[in-house]
Amino acid sequence: MADKHKIIRDSIHGDIKLEGLFLDLLETPEIQRLYNIKQLGLAHLVFPGAHHTRLEHSLGTYHMASQAVEQLNLDNHERQMVSCAALLHDIGHGPFSHTLESILRNLLDVDHVDLTEKLIFGKYEIFDAIEKEIIKSPSVDEILDNHSIDKKKITEIIRGKTHDKPYLSQLLNSAIDVDQLDYLIRDAYYTGVAYGMIDVERFLQTLTINENNLMIKRKGVGVVENILMARGLMYSSVYFHKTVRIAELMLSKALEITPDVDPFQFFKMTDAELINELKTMGPFQHEIATRLKYRKLFKQAYWASSSNLDEARLTVVKNLENKKHHREKEREIENALNIPAGRVIIDVPYQEIHQAEPRIDQTDIMIVDKEEIKSLDDYTPIAGAIRSRAVPDWIIMIVTDERFRDDVSKKAEKILFS
């Protein structure tokens, strides 16, 4: 009898084949839930095609990881570990992907990677008792046990902490890895921007392992430059598009000011479930859900880049990274201008960006040139330019309900920096 397998037709990579362990994992509720979580959160409000899901990205990352381990001629055990980590690396994402992660981090000091690890070890469930009774499917941790998979090694690869063999985790978590490659190409395709044209085949051909680390052959410098440029442009043009950011801030604020919110509970939800739940949480939360449904977003009332501010004001902005102080300043502006709670939102994005995606300005890529190992900086100025480029353009932004925009525009700066 032929081996049981499934072929999934992917918009980016074509046919993706899953069998054995990977087919079993695909059928778990943790993976299937990702069908209902958009890869780019609320970006579809600006880029109407951006309705692709975390599941598509997880499959794409698995596919590229499988290609990479084959090209590198890793042994069967290593291939299985890397491919498994690639398929599972995003199962801990909550609704709207990264949009709400700062709330989870602020309330519980955990992120989606921590939740991914909990799911892998069976310490956290994403379904309730009724759902569990209906679906009756093995969970990720049960499938891993059935196949005698080393869960600790899987989580080390996902976290980038395989210290004995760094190249294993570097395939999934480094300055350039298959996770980033898939989401850059996929997100560019679905948003319609022209920044994700990356020669994947060429990139894979230039991968090599040297001194137990993943490196790039000299002939791959050009494609690495292309990837770094695509990453920078995607962050400024898509991931931190101002209007997308405003929508994300509104959703986060609706949950942030909900009394007695249980972040673990809402992180189990899908996108649609969360929006429906918002409508039951109170008048403000219902309003935000309705505004997001009909794209009636708050407006920018104040904006500044780092070059617009002197040292004293930069210090004020830096202090706003403290969440308690941040909320107090929002309330101060609302009280001074007689604005209802929740309708003034201050965005200080730098810290949040680097917590959500610490690789954003990583360029520590080593190049193998004949018998020498050199830094990417030795071959191109692009690496330095990426590190020095600010993403997004603003260091601080204040958004508000359009009814209060003029008042906030006129007076917020004085209140903020007084």
Where are these regions (language model features)?
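Histidine-centered, transition-metal-coordinating active-site segments
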Residues: 1-81, 91-418
